Amino acid sequence: MASRSAQQVGTLEWWQQGGKWFSYEGHAIFSRMAGQGEPLILLHGFPTASWDWHRMWPMLTQQYNVLVLDMLGFGFSDKPVPYDYSIEDQADLFEGWISGLGLKTVHLFAHDYGCSVTQELLAREQEGTLPFRIASICFLNGALFPEVHHPLLIQKLLCSPLGGLISRGLSRRTFERNFRRLLGPANPPDRQDMDDFWQLLTYNNGRGILHHLIHFMEERRCHRNRWVGALQKATQPMRLVSGVADPVSGAAMARRYRELVPNADVVSLRNVGHYPHFESPWDVFSAYREFRKQQ
């Protein structure tokens, strides 16, 4: 029995069974919490889920009180249709969740789509409307500056008038081909990894809403001044960890960060792509731990 349960640790089933659900606007949101120490909130990317962080979970929970959720429309959370999905709404979700837990100060560690949510939360803090304090921020391969974001063709198609057809007709093969393009050569996913990512994407008919979720690319352009301004005005410690082999938001994004963010702190990971925390978890953890020790 012990060996069987040991085998289950680290599986998608283990991840789901260790979670709890809460309600947001009448919709079920999946979350996980573990560890002791200062609260650390993990924010996942598109089109995946909190599962992206599972390889770092044992490392992070040894050091911090780690909290993560699947945003509305992602992973094991509800994926309502119709629904007006937006970065601002996801920020409302995090704001309500964090304040509801009674947390007064948190650290944020964000990837991709989660970086945009973090920028919105940071802007709210600077406006004095956030009910908690952001102590530090670490970004992972986020499209922080839309002018140097290079979306894949499939992402452009999802944004087009054909988006609904593309979303509903997305095959496992097409998904896997495009997903692998995002990754570096260091640690490619195996078949089980791709099974897990596909299961999360298709859970609760998630495939049918991708064209709604991807409106965030337009939101980034519309809110650029607000969200980039938030980075430039930030007073708390910030670090960007960049997998520079990422074709979408890798080396060019890191260069732009250095150009626009005062006292830019950037760690570049060679041969690592868009999912550094999945591809090279120990390197990302080392970079994050060093960042926190400097504070």
Per-region residue spans from a language model:
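Alpha/beta-hydrolase fold catalytic core
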Residues: 1-40, 61-64, 103-104, 286-295
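Active-site loop/oxyanion-hole signature of alpha/beta-hydrolase fold enzymes
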Residues: 14-15, 22-26, 34, 68-110, ...
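Conserved HGGG/HGGXW glycine-rich cap/lid loop of the alpha/beta-hydrolase fold
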Residues: 30-76
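The conserved beta1-alpha1 loop
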Residues: 43-45, 111, 242
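Conserved hydrolase catalytic core segment
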Residues: 104-149
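Helix-rich cap/lid subdomain of alpha/beta-hydrolase
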Residues: 146-199
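Conserved serine/cysteine hydrolase catalytic core
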Residues: 206-259, 268
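Catalytic active-site module of serine/aspartate enzymes centered on a nucleophile-bearing elbow/loop
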Residues: 263-295
